[in-house]
């Protein structure tokens, strides 16, 4: 497993807490575990990758032994509660909670006792429990019955706690052993949410189930109506030190600094995109206030785009998640087959993202650019490149044009149709300018580039709703034969087509139901045109079905996987037939020889939702988009060279196993070899590394590398029509090489007469390498560099 990012596009955060020593910041995410770092938001590290569900509520308790790790209590809205005393290496469920179905509040008293209180729900009843042993066990201190109440605990060291109940506003100063009714609640209600400011008596704030905000300046004895609450998502808090400062959260943070006389939002959601470092992201799941070591207080604002802090009551804010808080919530990811450095991703509320650079290092984690806000999924491309990428937002189709400098286009959904929240779309496997949109009917969109207009046609007359409320929710074409197609509906019916999706035949039996938001996972085999898998809801029924007869019948293919949702299915790119399945909490693998699925997440990958998967064709790797911990790669064979028998990546007609570079179509066996420093013909040497005739000169510096008598150092022989010395011409025997030298003075020296040279005609001359050879050699080197 290898984590790939994003390093800078954080997703939803819920809660932040200081460690008791005040030096460490802990934060809980949505399905991304628990994190800790320095107070300024640097040096983030995950301590909850082995903890499913993330953390909506969080408290940190001092260890029993000084020097040991702090004790961390993490709880989810859905009732999962766990404790760790070893920095997240292990998590244990506390005793005494009786498997709650929900958690409304988790608080810690700060007076040194570290007493914990948790308000849980189960079977429609709410119960307040207490722990005095650092969260190892809890016991009941108050039963609220069917009333959905809330708890406020003093944050300055006082033992005071306040409980909203059907009997009224209750107060205890003895850790819940006894309770005093302070007064009635402001109105009759079935639920109340509570916050308070210790700067008052205290001042308490309550929001009822009727979305009305009330204020009490006498610890709950009397209440005054303040305002009607809109854009409210159950998030509220009040300042510890400023009695008039209170805020609630929804899409925005609504804030008052004068006790409710006036209200203002901190910033609009669209302000974030021009200034993410100093403007809040939209959607506020949490607001937290902590005292700091300087005697002031710090607000933490938990958003769908990471964690922020403020030292001035949210007049200004600072983003703590621009680096290292890797809790991206991705629906899908698409890596370009033309350039694996190009990766596009669709996120929950962090938009459509791209990256064009892979970081170096042992654990390369990518940074992404958000080029459009919103929620995007089902990224699809006809040829796997980014020249045309289609995806969906809940309301329109997004088209990315261009690999290097992408630009975006928007298309409408078909009118009067039904589909999941993020509808399934599939690129036409035979036309990069077309895609399919399954709904009650199947539609095909195609771009006419001559007039730059999109046409939308009803591709098939088949009504997949069968007159009811269902619709087509997953579609796949066979990579073996694009005329063969497979489809699933939201209620688990399966269909198959043999004419590219024009006509359909329903299968004899059912497939899994869909995920209401995203549809099913559907995978057509790249090895067998008749094999297809469909994954979906596996709660009480098999989550994966397989057909090996072209979709005529399906059978369960689920052995080894328990009750869970199957979000994604993928097939290894090496032709081995190995499969992976991404589920609600982990990843499973199944090889063709296996009789069951094997869980492979282990301890190296996070326990989270593995929403989608793609096969990386240039390496034997499956890339997962997770909903909470970003992008993760699972490598089948980490040491594999990346060459698989069934692949021809560069399209030069030579399979990867026979090609010396299957990413360059100009390099293949039989190609013309050039003096360019590249082995073009896979022999496996380049001309500047070959000396076939053994004359000491490589081919690129030798005018004939098949004849050892021909080289720049050879003796030129005139008149034989052979350029022995590679100067570009044969020597003419009648052409003097230079001015005739004077006869030697030494009379004893033999005279050389014309004709004494025998059969060489007296013209044999030995040339010593001169300046011209140096110039020729330098020119040859320069040419090689220019061509390299």
Summary of predicted features, one role per range:
Residues 1-640:
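Beta-propeller blade termini and top-face loops
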Residues 768-785:
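A cross-kingdom C-terminal cell-surface attachment/processing module
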Residues 641-760:
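Extracellular calcium-associated, cysteine-rich motifs in secreted modular proteins
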Residues 760-770:
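Short, threonine-centered small-residue motifs that mark membrane-proximal processing/anchoring sites
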Residues 67, 199, 291, 303, ...:
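Intrinsic disorder/low-complexity segments enriched in polar/small residues
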Residues 46, 93, 140, 181, ...:
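Disulfide-rich extracellular modules and peptides
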């Amino acid at each position: 497993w290898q984590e790939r990012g994003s390093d800078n596009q954080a997703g939803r955060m819920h809660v932040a807490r200081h460690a008791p020593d005040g030096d460490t910041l802990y934060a809980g995410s949505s399905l991304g575990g628990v994190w800790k770092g320095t107070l300024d938001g640097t040096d983030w590290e995950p301590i909850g990758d082995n903890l499913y569900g993330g953390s909506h509520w969080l408290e940190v308790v001092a260890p029993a032994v000084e020097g040991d790790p702090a004790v961390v209590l993490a709880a989810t809205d859905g009732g999962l509660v766990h404790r760790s005393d070893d920095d997240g290496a292990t998590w244990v469920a506390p005793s005494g909670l009786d498997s709650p179905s929900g958690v409304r509040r988790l608080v810690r008293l700060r007076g040194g006792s570290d007493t914990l209180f948790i308000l849980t729900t189960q079977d429609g009843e709410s119960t307040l429990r207490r722990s005095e042993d650092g969260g190892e066990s809890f016991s009941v201190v108050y039963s609220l019955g069917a009333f959905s109440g809330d708890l406020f605990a003093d944050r300055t060291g006082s033992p005071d706690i306040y409980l909203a109940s059907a009997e009224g506003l209750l107060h205890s100063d003895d850790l819940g052993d006894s309770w005093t009714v302070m007064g009635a609640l402001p109105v009759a209600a079935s639920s109340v949410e509570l916050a308070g400011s210790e700067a008052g008596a205290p001042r308490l704030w309550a929001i009822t189930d009727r979305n009305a905000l009330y204020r009490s300046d006498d610890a709950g004895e009397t209440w005054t109506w303040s305002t009607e609450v809109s854009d409210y998502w159950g998030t509220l808090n009040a300042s510890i030190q400023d009695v008039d400062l209170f805020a609630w959260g929804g899409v925005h943070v609504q804030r008052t600094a004068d006790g409710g006389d006036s209200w203002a939002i901190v910033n609009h959601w669209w302000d974030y995109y021009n200034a993410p470092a100093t403007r809040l992201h939209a959607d506020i799941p949490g607001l937290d206030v902590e005292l700091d070591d300087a005697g002031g207080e710090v607000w933490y604002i938990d958003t769908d785009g990471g964690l922020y802090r403020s030292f001035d009551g949210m007049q200004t804010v600072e983003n703590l998640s621009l680096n290292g808080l890797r809790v991206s919530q991705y629906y899908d990811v698409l890596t370009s087959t033309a350039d694996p450095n190009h990766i596009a991703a669709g996120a929950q509320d962090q938009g459509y993202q791209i990256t064009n650079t892979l970081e170096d290092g042992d654990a390369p984690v990518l940074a992404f650019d958000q080029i459009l806000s919103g929620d995007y999924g089902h990224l699809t491309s006809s040829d796997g490149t980014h020249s045309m990428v289609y995806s969906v937002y809940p309301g329109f189709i997004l088209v990315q044009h261009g690999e290097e400098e992408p630009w975006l286009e928007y298309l409408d959904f078909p009118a009067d149709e039904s589909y999941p929240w993020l509808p399934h779309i599939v690129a036409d496997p035979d036309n990069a300018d077309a895609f399919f949109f399954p709904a009650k009917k199947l539609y095909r969109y195609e771009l006419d580039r001559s007039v730059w207009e999109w046409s939308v046609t009803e591709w098939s007359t088949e009504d997949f709703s069968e007159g009811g409320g269902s619709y087509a929710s997953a579609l796949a074409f066979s990579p073996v034969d694009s005329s063969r197609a497979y489809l699933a509906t939201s209620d688990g019916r399966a269909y198959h087509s043999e004419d590219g999706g024009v006509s359909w035949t329903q299968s004899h039996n059912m497939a899994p139901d869909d995920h209401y938001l995203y549809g099913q996972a559907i995978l057509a085999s790249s090895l067998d045109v008749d094999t297809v898998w469909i994954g979906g809801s596996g709660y009480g029924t098999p989550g994966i079905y397989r057909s090996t007869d072209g979709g005529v019948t399906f059978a369960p293919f689920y052995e080894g996987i328990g009750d869970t949702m199957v979000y994604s299915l993928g097939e290894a790119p090496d032709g081995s037939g190995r499969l992976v399945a991404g589920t609600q909490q982990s990843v499973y693998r199944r090889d063709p020889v296996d009789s069951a699925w094997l869980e492979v997440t282990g301890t190296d990958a996070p326990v989270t939702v593995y929403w989608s998967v793609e096969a990386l064709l240039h390496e034997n790797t499956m890339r997962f988009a997770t909903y909470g911990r970003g992008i993760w790669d699972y490598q089948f064979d980490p040491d594999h060279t990346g060459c698989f028998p069934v692949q021809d990546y560069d399209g030069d007609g030579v399979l990867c196993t026979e090609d010396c570079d299957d990413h360059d179509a100009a390099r293949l066996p039989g190609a013309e070899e050039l003096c360019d420093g590249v082995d073009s013909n896979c022999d496996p040497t380049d001309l500047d590394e070959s000396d076939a005739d053994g004359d000491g000169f490589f081919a690129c510096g030798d005018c004939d590398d098949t004849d050892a008598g021909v080289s720049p150092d050879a003796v030129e022989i005139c008149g034989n029509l052979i350029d022995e010395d590679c100067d570009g011409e044969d020597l003419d025997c009648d052409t003097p090489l230079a001015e005739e030298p004077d006869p030697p003075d030494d009379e004893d020296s033999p005279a050389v007469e014309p004709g004494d040279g025998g059969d060489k005609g007296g013209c044999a001359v030995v040339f010593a390498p001169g300046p011209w050879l140096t110039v020729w050699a330098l020119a040859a080197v320069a040419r090689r560099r220019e061509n390299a």
